[in-house]
Design a protein with these regions (language model features):
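Sec-dependent N-terminal signal peptides
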Residues: 3-11
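N-terminal export/targeting and maturation segments
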Residues: 13-75
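Long, charged/polar, surface-exposed segments that mediate recognition or autoinhibition
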Residues: 66-122
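Secondary-structure transition/turn motif
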Residues: 73, 153-158
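Low-complexity, intrinsically disordered Gly/Pro/Thr-rich segments
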Residues: 124-141
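Short, exposed beta-strand-loop hairpins at the edges of beta-sheets
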Residues: 137-146, 151-153
Length: 158
């Protein structure tokens, strides 16, 4: 009886990693929010929705997207040609400084120096080729290795 009780106590102490269970690979859901000029070949992403209080005037909920998106070499280049604003500056993120809320599959790309950070302006300020039409939000693309882009988006939904 003690062994069974000890087993259940131990099992209740182990927390499942929710991040790993929520990773999607079907690009159709991702394409509901992000409008890229080229086809996505492969993607791993999470979409989380946070309801806001009744006093919120602009949004009823915030949609957070963390995605790692793979493209062909030609499509990868086309994305950056079509970006309306590019901000290039050194970006150094060490493992110990990495934001805790980034999922592991995104976090692994932020362990070395990167020379480029591409931030795409949101629709609120000027036209944005990468969010769906009439969408308020902010989108950041980090180019990483092998024609892959990390995308972090916050979208306001009414």
């Amino acid at each position: 009886m003690r062994k069974i009780l000890l087993f259940f106590i131990c099992m209740s102490c182990i927390k499942p990693n929710k991040t790993e269970n929520n990773i999607h690979t079907d690009t159709k859901e991702l394409e509901k929010y992000i409008n890229l000029p080229v086809a996505i070949q492969k993607a791993e992403y999470e979409i989380s929705k946070t309801k806001l209080g009744e006093l919120s005037q602009d949004c009823s909920q915030i949609i957070e997207i963390h995605a790692v998106i793979k493209f062909s070499n030609q499509d990868y280049k086309a994305i950056f040609k079509s970006a309306n604003k590019k901000y290039n500056f050194p970006l150094i993120v060490k493992k110990e400084d990495c934001r805790d809320w980034y999922p592991p599959y995104v976090k692994k790309y932020f362990v070395k120096e990167s020379n480029e950070l591409f931030k795409i302006n949101s629709v609120v300020y000027e036209e944005n080729n990468f969010l769906k039409e009439n969408t308020k939000g902010n989108l950041i693309f980090f180019p990483v290795e092998n024609n892959t882009i990390c995308c972090i988006a916050s979208i306001c939904e009414k």
